[in-house]
């Protein structure tokens, strides 16, 4: 990790430790059907792991960088629901933050208690730029949550998901015909929830041609 224990770095983290935390809510703990807001962390300064989770959520990139220099292992810290700093950067579409975390070897396939990866989180909020970045760093485009929801299934629940759907469907490893626990394809969900379903159906057709499922 190197010797990063300079006075300036310690000072930055100490400022963060005593920072006034806004009384907001952190988005976390989603199940496969709906978003949930979990109770805010009322004391993020109590540990360096909680500090980095809070700082990422507030997009305080300089403070996050200093925390990582002091303790690089915090890059994969988890909250009570299993969300990592990278999950939080992904669902907020903090692309520069996500890039910093990935450069410090954040796990792009880390899973929450419900089996969500950072890519699921990016797709839930139609954050195409973060989704693209995660795929570049080895995120599993077909990762299944506990409900067998892939990132493509999650994308399909968003009415205006054209950009993110395109990013996923252009990935060479995408399997658009995977079914979730309800035995639904992503295209079926997309047809029910929004105007982007032609993209999903075109993706399935291209996949079928590529894999020889149709003549």
UniProtKB/Swiss-Prot annotation:
Tell me how this protein sits in the membrane. Peripheral membrane protein
Q: Which keywords fit this entry according to its UniProt record?
A: ANK repeat, Cell membrane, Cytoplasm, Developmental protein, Membrane, Repeat
What are the start and end residues of each ANK repeat? 81-110, 114-143
Describe what happens without this gene.
Lethal. RNAi-mediated knockdown in the wing disrupts cell polarity and decreases levels of dsh phosphorylation.
Q: What SUPFAM superfamilies does this protein map onto?
A: Ankyrin repeat
| Any one annotated GO CC term | plasma membrane
Principal location listed in the UniProt entry: cytoplasm
Provide the effect of residue 87 to Y: Lethal. Pupal wings containing clones display reduced levels of dsh, reduced asymmetric localization of stan, delayed trichome initiation, and formation of trichomes in the cell center rather than at the distal cell edge
Q: Does the keyword Ribonucleoprotein apply?
A: no
* Superkingdom assignment: Eukaryota
Q: Which GO terms describe its biological process?
A: regulation of establishment of planar polarity
Name its cellular compartments.
Answer: Cytoplasm, Cytosol; Cell membrane
Q: What does this protein do?
A: Required for regulating the establishment of planar cell polarity in the wing. Forms a complex with Bdbt which likely functions in the regulation of planar polarity by promoting the activity of Dco during planar polarity establishment. Within the complex, probably functions to stabilize Bdbt, while Bdbt directly promotes Dco activity in regulating phosphorylation of core proteins such as dsh, and asymmetric localization.
- Quaternary structure per UniProt? Interacts with Bdbt; interaction promotes the stability of both complex members.
State the protein's name. Ankyrin repeat domain-containing protein 49
Question: Taxonomic classification, please?
Answer: Eukaryota, Metazoa, Ecdysozoa, Arthropoda, Hexapoda
Name the gene: Ankrd49
């Amino acid at each position: 990790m190197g010797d990063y224990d300079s006075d300036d770095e310690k000072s930055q983290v100490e400022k963060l430790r005593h920072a006034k935390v806004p009384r907001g809510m952190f988005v976390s703990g989603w199940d496969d059907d709906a978003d949930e807001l979990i109770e805010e962390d009322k004391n993020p300064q109590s540990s360096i792991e909680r500090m980095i989770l809070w700082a990422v959520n507030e997009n305080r990139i300089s403070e996050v960088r200093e925390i990582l220099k002091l303790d690089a292992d915090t890059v994969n810290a988890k909250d009570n629901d299993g969300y990592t700093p990278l999950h939080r950067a992904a669902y907020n579409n903090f692309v520069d933050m996500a890039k910093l975390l990935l450069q410090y070897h954040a796990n792009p396939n880390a899973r929450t208690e419900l089996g969500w990866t950072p890519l699921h989180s990016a797709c839930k909020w139609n954050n195409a730029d973060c989704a693209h970045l995660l795929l570049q760093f080895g995120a599993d485009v077909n990762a299944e949550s506990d409900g067998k929801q892939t990132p493509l299934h999650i994308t399909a629940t968003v009415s205006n998901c054209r950009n993110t759907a395109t990013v996923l469907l252009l990935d060479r490893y995408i399997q658009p015909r995977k079914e979730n626990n309800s035995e639904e394809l992503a295209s079926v969900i997309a047809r029910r929830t929004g105007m982007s379903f032609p993209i999903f159906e075109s993706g399935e057709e291209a996949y079928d041609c590529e894999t020889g499922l149709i003549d």
